[in-house]
């Protein structure tokens, strides 16, 4: 950790429109969620979070010593259902973690009202949402705390990495210390070239700092984002929407492509035909994914003992089509042609 990390943090702050010092880079998005959770809540506290998210979200909460409480999603957006979340509040609930699924932040106004009503911290898992806006404001420029991911397939990559963004100085101080084994103020000393061998540790910490090499990659990626990566992702998502919206066997998520830069291109395949379509596309040379298996079905997080019927239905319909800035419109059209062919014959 050194000058490149400091430069990357400062450039991210400028991009997001926040003050220098409000961005803390770490070595993964999972680490960002873990450190933010550890800084925001205490051991044994509960965090409301949708089950339909990458297991890294749950493992990060678990590693922070908190308890993830699985909630339903809204089928139209695959974002957290606040009505269901309200039913799961207990005296131990201390935070809500909205997941910006496929770059869609959902109704953040409602989420922050909900949090204020119940006295909760809001830790946004914005791993998919770098570069997205909400009501004209950049995700990361407002609210409580946001966690970004810069792994190899995200909107920008540093090879591997993540960041915590917050205007809360107590939160930031805890995250900065915890990313480097809990050593108090070590980040500031290192950046100032005044590293001291005399230090104290008062809170648990981890080895989660970002290296200079990863930060240097991230800086170049950030320079390419607005003019290259973002417009290409948006254009490809629009083309998918134009070609797939008319198909009666598919449901597209209710996403406004104006303010978001889509990380994924998920669709819902209706009528129990998801797996058949996936097999058809594989035979046509089209790789697909399923984002994600709900966490409440995983052994560590309940093994399905508490059913979430809406989430389970959405999961059974989910299929992610190829989306990355290296694709061209012709690639999207070939994928959609294979999808159309399936529905014409099934």
What is the meaning of each model-derived region?
Residues 3-11, 17-21, 83, 95-99, ...:
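PLP-dependent aminotransferase class I/II
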Residues 39-126, 133:
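PLP-dependent aminotransferase-like
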